[in-house]
């Protein structure tokens, strides 16, 4: 039995994000989003999805599991992540993630000359990052390896793109670019009860058709509802803890759990936090 009232999935959930951007049948949606983000700086013609789970050089190393990991027709690597809540060392985590697509390019033997393909880390942030390096009124942040004095590019093989989608506040009639439209649906898809005229293009026709919950199988619906519940549970717990002025540690735990997609009530070792936020 369906319990979800919305017509379309939320792209902020783990299930919704990966269904739209991380599956082979929907790779055209990922390609369109990336091209709208890069706006001519990079033109992606095709993508191949790669294994999103990585481990280090030895079995004791920590795993890294990406939301979406793919390469384009030139062999350049893309990690695409949705980050729903602040994490203390999030920038360090992004840098750590970047080491995997860099290291896996190493060729065995003595013939490799260390030439690398470009690696892009694209992160969609569902909160205000409030980073001192960023302009407060800017949504897109483009980070690379630069000389501090000249501000010229030192090496162009590693790019971080942070997109603070929570700052996007255009109304539907104000959407001008394809990129505007993507940011709008990332924020608002699950709130819509029909496909607006402003979003009736070939790619968004595909998106709305794929995102319609009524078309899900029972298994897909169950998986989505679990993902949505996990998202709402942790969000509600986080908001409640912040309102009550609970400890930063408790709030940080809730935020970290949100990234793991875990319903808070199912974590016995977090019973104290859960009780605080009831």
Model-flagged regions — what are they?
Residues 1-161, 169-171:
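Accessory alpha/beta interaction modules
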Residues 2-6, 78-83, 183-278:
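Short, charged alpha-helical interaction segments and adjacent helix-coil junctions
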């Amino acid at each position: 039995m369906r319990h979800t009232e919305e017509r379309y999935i939320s792209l902020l959930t783990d299930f919704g994000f990966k269904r739209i951007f991380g599956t082979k049948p929907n790779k055209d949606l990922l390609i369109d989003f990336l091209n709208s983000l890069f706006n001519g700086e990079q033109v992606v013609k095709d993508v191949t999805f790669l294994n999103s789970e990585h481990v280090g050089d030895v079995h004791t190393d920590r795993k890294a599991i990406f939301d979406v990991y793919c390469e384009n027709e030139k062999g350049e690597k893309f990690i695409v992540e949705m980050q729903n809540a602040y994490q203390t060392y999030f920038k360090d985590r992004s840098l750590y993630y970047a080491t995997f697509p860099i290291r896996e390019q190493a060729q065995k033997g003595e013939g490799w000359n260390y030439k690398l393909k470009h690696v892009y880390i694209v992160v969609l942030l569902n909160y205000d990052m409030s980073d001192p390096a960023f302009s407060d009124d800017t949504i897109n942040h483009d980070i690379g390896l630069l000389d501090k004095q000249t501000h010229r590019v030192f090496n162009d093989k590693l790019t971080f793109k942070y997109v603070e989608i929570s700052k996007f506040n255009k109304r539907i009639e104000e959407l001008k670019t394809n990129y505007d439209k993507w940011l709008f649906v990332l924020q608002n898809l699950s709130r819509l009860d029909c496909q607006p005229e402003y979003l009736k293009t070939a790619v968004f026709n595909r998106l709305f058709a794929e995102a319609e919950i009524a078309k899900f199988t029972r298994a897909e619906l169950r998986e989505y509802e679990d993902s949505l519940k996990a998202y709402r549970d942790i969000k509600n717990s986080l908001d409640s803890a912040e309102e009550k002025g609970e400890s930063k540690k408790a709030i940080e735990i809730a935020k970290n759990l949100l990234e793991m997609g875990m319903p808070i009530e199912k974590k016995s070792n977090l019973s104290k936090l859960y009780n605080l936020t009831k």
